[in-house]
């Protein structure tokens, strides 16, 4: 719609040049007292002036509608961004707790001198609710789609940033729910990297939502 508005504004500029041409003809005819030239100039000025005004008003109208739609999308984007951040933080909190539980069980299993039977880290991971985490990610999925639909490209964060934040959180989930594939030291290192990364994503989104970015 902004393209259409710009086209009509461009046409109004061209038409205005025609108006000037007819106005000059009208003026020359008036000065030289040439009724023919004066009549043509006057008629042409009126017609081309009307066309110019019409093009100008249509162009402004289209640009006004486009600006309104863009503003509405940006407001919706901001509203969804706040929902995304709230759900993102809740998911981080849940994953941090689960990840810490795996870490504690695994480190105890490897390094404790306690004679009691240790709890295997995989048993801890297997005890986590898949449904709970799926619910978190389903909500984030829906927010991602809404952000994509309302992304004007004019705000300081785009849909793509939220998608990267989501992907990083999904990696954290996979590590926490399937920890043994990396070995304990790999698990600890990866966990720290994921935890720091998702926390940084969350902080930047919060600054954006607070208007401080």
Segments predicted by a language model, with ranges:
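Short, solvent-exposed, charged loop/turn and helix-capping segments
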Residues: 121-163, 210-213
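Transmembrane signal-anchor/signal-peptide helices with a preference for the extracytoplasmic
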Residues: 28-33, 59-79
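Membrane-embedded alpha-helical segments of integral membrane proteins
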Residues: 1-33
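Heptad-repeat amphipathic alpha-helical coiled-coil interaction surface used
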Residues: 12, 19, 45, 52, ...
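Hydrophobic membrane-insertion alpha-helices, especially the h-region
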Residues: 48-63
């Amino acid at each position: 719609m902004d393209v259409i508005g710009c086209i009509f504004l461009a046409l109004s500029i061209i038409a205005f040049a025609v108006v000037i041409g007819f106005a000059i003809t009208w003026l020359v005819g008036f000065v030289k007292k040439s009724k023919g030239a004066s009549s043509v100039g006057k008629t042409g000025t009126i017609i081309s002036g009307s066309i110019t005004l019409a093009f100008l008003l249509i162009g402004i109208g289209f640009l006004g509608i486009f600006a309104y739609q863009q503003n509405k999308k940006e407001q919706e984007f901001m509203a969804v961004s706040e929902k995304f951040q709230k759900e993102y933080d809740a998911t981080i909190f849940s994953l941090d707790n689960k990840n810490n539980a795996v870490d504690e069980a695994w480190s105890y299993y490897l390094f404790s001198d306690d004679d009691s039977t240790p709890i295997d880290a995989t048993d801890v991971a297997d005890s986590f609710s898949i449904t709970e985490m799926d619910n978190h990610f389903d909500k984030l999925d829906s927010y991602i789609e809404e952000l994509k639909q309302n992304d004007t490209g004019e705000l300081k964060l785009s849909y793509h940033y939220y998608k990267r934040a989501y992907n990083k959180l999904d990696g954290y989930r996979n590590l926490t729910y399937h920890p043994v594939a990396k070995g304990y030291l790999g698990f600890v290192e990866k966990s720290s990297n994921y935890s720091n990364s998702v926390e940084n994503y969350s902080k930047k989104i919060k600054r954006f939502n607070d208007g401080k970015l």
